[in-house]
Amino acid sequence: MAVHVVRFGDTLWKISSMYGVPIQTIIAINGLTSTFIIPGLALYIPDNMLPNRTYKIKSGDVIWKLAQQFHIGPSTIIQANPGIDPNRLRIGQNITIPSPLKLAIRTLGFMMPSTISANVSTLNSLANELTYLAVVAYSITNEGWAFNLMDDSAIVSRSWQLNIKPLLVVQNVAHGDFSAELVGQVLENPTRRKNLTESLVNLARQRRFSGVSIDFEFIPPAKRQDFILFLRELKTALGSLILHVNLPSKTADIPTNRIIGAYDYAAIARIADIVAVMTMDYGYAGGPPDPISPINWMEQVIQYSLTQIPHTKMQIALPLYGHDKIVPSNRTTMLPVLAAQNQAISTGAPIQFNNISKAPWYRYWHEGMEHVVWFEDIRSYIEMYKLVDLYQLAGTTYWELSFPAPQNWAYLKNNITVVKR
């Protein structure tokens, strides 16, 4: 695997010759619209090298044992880590191990039903890269009844045909926004909780879902225990069906906080089959220009989360979108990562890379107004997958599958094994 960051004077022809990869392959894998490129653009160049694994040294580790574990020669590990003393490995030290044993994870992609042809086309193209399909098409009434917002039958049917397990995503959405009042009213009332549990189980079974994915956001902190009661009741009723729960990111438990206070990570993890921590929107819509998922913050979230959630149950979220912000108003437009990349090319804006957050960004002007764009590229995605490997997490989630992210999917296909079970 190679990543080429474009410099002044580079051309696709020059890069193609350098790596021995056809220009059209580079264009396709990176989603380019022409042969024009700009400084700072990161290009993913596929090759036949072994995938790199990321490993944290533990007590008792020695090079020859690691070589056996990862099916590689000791000299390969030593060559991949210049500067380390193979006879004095430090506990907690991170090393790179080229290995034929790929990282194996369970992936989940969120999809909002739109046109059947577009949804099915997306599923067809990503069939081998998804374990679960989370269908975002359900909300709840004031009385707790879950209901369908749009037709999802074709998506569910196609996902089964492609060996992707469909999950019913239910949200506390009212009038287009997440409603704390709505979910609070339902969770606090035993009858409404019962309505919600029964309707979710019935819908999941009737519509042939393999389980339910809960996405209740801004639950009032006072309803923390009610949420646990609901999840326990729901899991009991679901039986062998999957209970997947999405949780807001945090680095400490603050029970009174209006955004994260209602979510008792440890208690939820004891009930749910899979827990997805939404490691996104550090840089949020309407806020100042910031990376959406800075790697240093993501690692802090993971480290806290693993004190509460077993690593075998935990997924982290990878954004497939960027934010285009007008400065200084911070008016924000969400755009797919591919659109963000190609907008930099079309405006001629050199792409910068922040080494602390491990995220790309650029600045451009339109109609006299300054725009700052943060997004993800192959470099930031690689860093995120390193965290999954380093902390031995269950896998990843992606918001949202309609956002093209060819670099991410190409890397996943070439370097990672997606578990189908």
Protein language model features and the residues they cover:
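Glycan-binding loop/region signatures in secreted carbohydrate-active enzymes
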Residues: 172-178, 182-183, 320-384, 414-421
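Primarily a LysM-type cell-wall glycan-binding module
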Residues: 1-20, 41-43, 47-71
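Glycan-recognition patch characteristic of GH18 chitinases/ENGases
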Residues: 100-196
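Substrate-binding surface in catalytic domains of secreted glycosidases
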Residues: 143-150, 224-225, 229, 233-345
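Hydrophobic faces of well-ordered beta-strands that scaffold small-molecule active sites
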Residues: 107-111, 131-135, 166-170, 212-214, ...
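Active-site groove signature of glycoside hydrolases
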Residues: 195-226, 274-288
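Intrinsically disordered, low-complexity Ser/Thr-rich linker and spacer segments
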Residues: 42-56, 65, 86, 93-116, ...
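Catalytic domains of carbohydrate-active enzymes, especially glycoside hydrolases
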Residues: 116-141, 199-212, 384-396
